[in-house]
Each structure stands twice: as structure tokens, then as C-alpha cells.
């Protein structure tokens, strides 16, 4: 429900952008002139369809491209997804002007972009191996526990704010992050539930925890572009 309410609120903000399109809202004038919005998407949330090559969501609850397409439809421009394997690559895309917007968690170190208000809450949890004593997310915040995480991902930012004792073990993308767990270099793998459910069959006896922690997702815009604040 929280995801839906945030998405509805964000869509309402998009509607305000379209209200004055006859005189072209200055916040989107450059997008209208270009005729397109280039949207950076993180590969942990979207993957390439092996048959069509198109980007598709990792789960039905991920609606970031749908939000971008709503904006595109409101202002009458094409939406062009641009996939990035890592968040730093997406930030570079925004910084050099190769992307117009992207979606990511907030972080003070992410200069060079403007953030909207939060538009979604995503659910994060852990994949743990067979025989693990970790039954709940809070159980993992102990000295000596190693949590495999994707560097700079929103789930990693969320955990780093709330966990005080566990050690984060970083990898660049989900596949090597899972390998840290599979090769016993980590005690848990933290990510979006849908991603973890995809990896669980590759590690016999593993399980995805039932409880969750949540974190916000924001739209990030190239500086001096629209900030979507009403």
C-alpha cells in the first residue's frame, strides 16, 4: 500500500507538469524540445528480455519505468531506457548529460544530481544458506556477521544506516554478490526480495527471510533540470 500511495502522489506531481503544456512548463521545456527522456535504470531492477532485448522489471512491484513513461505521456515525449550495471555508471550518465533522469536511493555523496521527493518504498531482505541461525533481518546485525551487498545499491544504503555491528562485504553487481554467499565469504545476501528469490534455487537449502526492511527510492535528475517539487 505504501508503494502505491507514493506512486500515486508522484503521478499527481507529473500531472501538474502537464497542466500548462500549451505554454510549455519551463521545468520540462528542454525535454519537450528534445522529444525524449533518456531514463537510466539499474540492472538489479531491470534485465534484458532474452527474446526481445527489451528491459523488463525484475518483479511486478518494480514500476520505475512505468513512472517515467507516465511523465513521457504527460508531456508528449518518447521514453528511452538506458541500462546501467552499477549506480556509479548511472550517476556518470547523468553528470555528462547522456541521461536525463534515473532512479536510486539518496546519498549525500551523490553530487551533481537533483533528487525528487521519495516516490517508492522498496522491500529488502536477506538470502541465507542452509543451517543459518539468522531467522529475522535484525538477527544479522551482530559482530562477526558478513552481509554481501551490491555496492551503492539502495538496499546497501538502507542497511548501512540501520545496521551498527555487521560487516558489509561489497561486490559491483548481483552475480558476484551472490557468489560471496555461495562460496561462504558472506553469511547473508541483502537485496530486493524478487532478486533473492531468483538466486535461492542456485543455493540448495537456502531461504529468503520472511521479514523485511524498507528504503525509499527517488528520481534523480541531471542538475538544473526539473526537480518535480510541484
Task: Cite the ranges covered by each PLM segment.
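A structural signal for short loop-to-beta-strand junctions that line the ligand-binding cleft
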Residues: 28, 54-59, 111-120, 207-211, ...
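Ligand-binding cleft/hinge of the Venus flytrap
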Residues: 49-55, 65-78, 117, 121, ...
Amino acid at each position: 500500500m505504501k508503494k502505491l500511495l507514493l506512486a500515486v502522489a508522484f503521478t499527481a506531481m507529473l500531472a501538474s507538469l502537464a497542466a500548462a503544456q500549451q505554454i510549455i512548463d519551463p521545468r520540462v521545456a528542454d525535454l519537450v524540445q528534445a522529444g525524449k527522456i533518456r531514463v537510466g535504470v539499474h540492472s538489479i531492477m531491470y534485465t534484458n528480455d532474452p527474446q526481445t532485448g527489451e528491459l523488463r522489471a525484475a518483479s511486478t512491484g518494480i514500476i520505475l519505468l512505468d513512472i517515467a513513461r507516465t511523465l513521457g505521456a504527460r508531456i508528449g515525449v518518447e521514453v528511452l531506457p538506458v541500462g546501467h550495471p552499477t549506480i556509479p555508471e548511472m550517476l556518470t550518465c547523468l553528470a555528462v548529460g547522456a541521461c536525463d533522469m534515473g532512479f536510486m536511493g539518496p546519498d549525500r555523496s551523490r553530487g551533481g544530481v537533483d533528487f525528487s521527493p521519495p516516490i517508492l518504498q522498496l522491500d529488502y531482505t536477506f538470502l541465507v544458506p542452509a543451517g543459518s541461525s539468522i531467522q529475522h533481518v535484525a538477527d544479522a546485525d551482530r559482530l562477526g556477521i558478513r552481509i554481501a551487498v551490491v555496492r551503492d545499491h539502495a538496499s546497501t544504503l538502507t542497511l548501512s544506516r540501520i545496521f551498527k555491528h555487521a560487516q558489509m562485504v561489497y561486490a559491483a553487481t548481483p552475480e558476484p554478490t551472490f557468489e560471496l554467499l555461495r562460496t561462504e565469504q558472506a553469511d547473508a545476501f541483502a537485496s530486493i526480495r524478487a532478486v533473492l528469490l531468483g538466486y535461492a534455487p542456485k543455493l540448495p537449502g537456502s531461504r529468503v527471510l520472511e521479514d523485511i526492511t524498507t528504503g525509499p527510492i527517488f528520481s534523480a535528475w541531471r542538475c538544473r533540470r526539473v526537480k518535480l517539487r510541484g
